[in-house]
Structure formats: structure tokens, C-alpha cells
């Protein structure tokens, strides 16, 4: 989950205290946001549910330790996410620099991950899957119109608001790439189950076309309740998953009832040659996608008009870049600890334990390198 908080032009505003039993920042009571509870953690740090004292609005705040963790992925996430304003995308609010962390403040989606919903249901009915897929494509289409490809679309990066008919919200733009700001993607990023074959070939690829493949994996999981390219005998063998992706080796189980139209759409998405794969505009005109399509998803202009501008002025790009530059400087306590532990050589023996594989997959299934 992604979250963050910052006051425009006031990087020194957030004093920190340390919570019981943890070495993570809590914004001081005098600050704008107050802690409600922790809501997640990952390689980045922790995400917390916070309350805006002025508006009483709940927000999600992602804390990333200052220093080397403020890398290109973090900067890309913030720069790209800041430009996106759409009902199916988690809203970026601001960044705050604390003495020890960079905090990214964003909209809170109280309905949790779409992944959690599918786990509870095993799989969705075709109508329910279509309802969420329509929203996913609406959000992805908007991203692409803004020249941003996500590159890590998956159920875990799609959140739901708390409404009775949940609205899907795309989050986590840490791997996203803008064709305006960046070159064509070359790096292998994302989660193996969702990665398009051309991404695995270590050549330049069209990030928008790769996003289409990932959307197809999401659709398949919703209607089937399993990943399309996992080996049924060894579902956690990620190397086999990668090989099956490269061979476009998948099937729909006989016991799963899916309409011919849905099967056709899936078959048009899972095409190994990206130049022959269905595009987002073509998906939006596909018969299966158009069935029961909500009126507000038919027109991009009407979707944009639903986006309410925040009361507070948005931080300028210059302000954000200044905060990011300062965030790359480690906190003083970390520098002292580094000096103290550096002389002990505690980590020397660990340097020889690097994996010798070309494609490095950790136990969670994340691709953990970039060419």
C-alpha cells in the first residue's frame, strides 16, 4: 500500500517521536496528521492510516527511510503519481520530509485490496469481474493518455473504496515510467505472474502493451481464481512460471464456466507478439467489456469531471524535487550508526552470498533486479 504526507514548502514541519517497540516515525501531535493505526509494510518501510486534523479526512501515509532508499523508483513514483487525477487512481496529496523519513501522503481506500476480496470469494462471477475490469481499464487508459505506463499492475496494487458498489483505485506507481520524462522501458520489473513475455526478453518494450498483458492476468485471476501461467503441480516455482509466460502456455479449467466473449478477450490479450496483442482502445470497444458498462466509464471527460480538486494547493514540482533531494541525505543517527558498525566488518561474509542467476526472484516472487 502506498501512502505519504507533506506540507508544501514546509519540510521542517514534522517533528517525530518513536512509538513503543518500533523504530518508525510518528508525526508529532502538534502536526497536521495524527496516527490512527499501521496498515501495511514492505521493502519500502511502513504505511500508516492517519487523520488530517483540519478536515478529519483519513489519509494513507507511506514512510520511506531517508538516504539510499530514496532512489529512482521512489522519485518516479512521486513525479508520475502527482500528475494523475482520475476516480480510478489513488489520489496523490503531498510529500513531507521528516528528520528520519520521507512521507508520501495519499488518498485512503478503506475497502482494502482487490486481492483480499478475491481470496475471500475464490473467484468472482463474470459480471463482478467485468465490473472491476471495466474500472481497471478506465484507470489504465487514463494513465496511458497521460503517457504513464504502470508496469506493475496486479490485484495487490488495486484498492477499493468503502462504498457499497466499490470503486477500484490503482495505486503504487513505483515502477511506472513516463514516455515524456523517461526512455522506453528496458528493465525487468513487476511480479512474475503478471509480467508480459516481452518484458522478460531484456529488450526495449512498449510499457503500455505490457500493461495490457497484466490487465489480462488480473481478469483471468478474477474469473478463474488462479494465476494463468503458474504450473499447477508447482505453483511456487517462479522459473517455471516465467517459462510458461514465454511460451504463452495457459488454459481455462473445464470446471470454470466462462462465456465465449470473455474467453475471446482473454485470448486476444495473451498474445506473445506485442504488436498483435489487443490494445486498450480495442478492449474498450470489445463486446464483453461493453456489456453493462456504467455510463460514467463510457466518456473520459465525464470521468475527469468527477475528480474533485483538493482544497489545499498542490505542491509545485520544484518544491517536491527540493524535498526529494534533501531526502536522499541519510539522517544523522544513521550516519553515526554506519560509522560505528563499519569498523566491525559484520557484513563482510554476507557479500559472498549473492545469487548467480540471471533472473533473480526472491521468496515473495518479486523480480528484484533491473538491467
UniProtKB/Swiss-Prot annotation:
Class of this enzyme: transferase
Compartments reported by the entry: Cytoplasm, Cytosol; Nucleus
Keyword ATP-binding: yes
CDD domains: STKc_SnRK2 (cd14662)
EC number: 2.7.11.1
Positions bound to ATP: 39-47, 62
Post-translational modification: May be phosphorylated.
Tissue: Expressed in leaf blades, leaf sheaths and roots. Expressed in shoots and roots of young seedlings.
Pfam families cross-referenced by the UniProt entry: Pkinase (PF00069)
Protein kinase domain mapped to chain residues: 33-289
Organism domain of life: Eukaryota
Stored InterPro entries: Kinase-like_dom_sf (IPR011009), Prot_kinase_dom (IPR000719), Protein_kinase_ATP_BS (IPR017441), Ser/Thr_kinase_AS (IPR008271)
Known role: May play a role in signal transduction of hyperosmotic response. Together with PYL10, PP2C53 and SAPK10, may form an abscisic acid (ABA) signaling module involved in stress response.
Family: Belongs to the protein kinase superfamily. Ser/Thr protein kinase family.
Protein name in UniProt: Serine/threonine-protein kinase SAPK8
Organism: Oryza sativa subsp. japonica
Lineage of origin: Eukaryota, Viridiplantae, Streptophyta, Embryophyta, Tracheophyta
Gene designation: SAPK8
Amino acid at each position: 500500500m502506498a501512502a505519504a504526507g507533506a506540507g508544501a514548502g514546509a519540510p521542517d514541519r514534522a517533528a517525530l517521536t518513536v512509538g513503543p517497540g518500533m523504530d518508525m516515525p510518528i508525526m508529532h501531535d502538534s502536526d497536521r496528521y495524527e496516527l490512527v493505526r499501521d496498515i501495511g509494510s514492505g521493502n519500502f518501510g511502513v504505511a500508516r492510516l492517519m487523520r488530517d486534523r483540519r478536515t478529519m479526512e483519513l489519509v494513507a501515509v507511506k514512510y520511506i527511510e531517508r538516504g539510499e532508499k530514496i532512489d529512482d523508483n521512489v522519485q518516479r513514483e512521486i513525479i508520475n503519481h502527482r500528475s494523475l487525477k482520475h476516480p480510478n487512481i489513488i489520489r496523490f496529496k503531498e510529500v513531507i520530509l521528516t528528520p528520519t523519513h520521507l512521507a508520501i501522503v495519499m488518498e485512503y481506500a478503506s475497502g482494502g485490496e482487490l486481492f483480499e476480496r478475491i481470496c475471500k470469494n475464490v473467484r468472482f462471477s463474470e459480471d463482478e469481474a467485468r465490473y472491476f475490469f471495466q474500472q481497471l481499464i478506465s484507470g489504465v487508459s487514463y494513465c496511458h493518455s497521460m503517457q504513464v505506463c504502470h508496469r506493475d499492475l496486479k490485484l495487490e496494487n488495486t484498492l477499493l473504496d468503502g462504498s457499497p458498489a466499490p470503486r477500484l483505485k490503482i495505486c503504487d506507481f513505483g515502477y511506472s515510467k513516463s514516455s515524456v520524462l523517461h526512455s522506453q522501458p528496458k528493465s525487468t520489473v513487476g511480479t512474475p505472474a503478471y509480467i508480459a513475455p516481452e518484458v522478460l526478453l531484456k529488450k526495449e518494450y512498449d510499457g503500455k502493451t505490457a500493461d495490457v498483458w497484466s490487465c489480462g492476468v488480473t481478469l483471468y485471476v478474477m474469473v478463474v481464481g488462479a494465476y494463468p501461467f503458474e504450473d499447477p503441480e508447482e505453483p511456487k516455482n517462479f522459473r517455471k512460471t516465467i517459462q510458461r509466460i514465454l511460451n504463452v502456455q495457459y488454459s481455462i479449467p473445464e470446471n470454470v464456466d466462462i462465456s465465449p466473449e470473455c474467453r475471446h478477450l482473454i485470448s486476444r490479450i495473451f498474445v506473445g507478439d506485442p504488436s498483435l496483442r489487443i490494445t486498450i482502445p480495442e478492449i474498450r470497444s470489445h463486446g464483453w467489456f461493453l456489456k453493462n458498462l456504467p455510463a460514467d466509464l463510457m466518456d473520459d471527460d465525464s470521468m475527469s469531471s468527477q475528480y474533485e480538486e483538493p482544497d489545499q494547493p498542490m505542491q509545485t514540482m520544484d518544491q517536491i524535487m527540493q524535498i526529494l533531494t534533501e531526502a536522499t541525505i541519510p539522517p544523522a543517527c544513521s550516519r553515526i550508526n554506519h560509522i560505528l558498525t563499519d569498523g566491525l566488518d559484520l557484513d563482510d561474509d554476507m557479500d559472498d552470498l549473492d545469487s548467480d542467476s540471471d533472473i533473480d526472484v526472491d521468496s515473495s516472487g518479486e523480480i528484484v533486479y533491473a538491467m
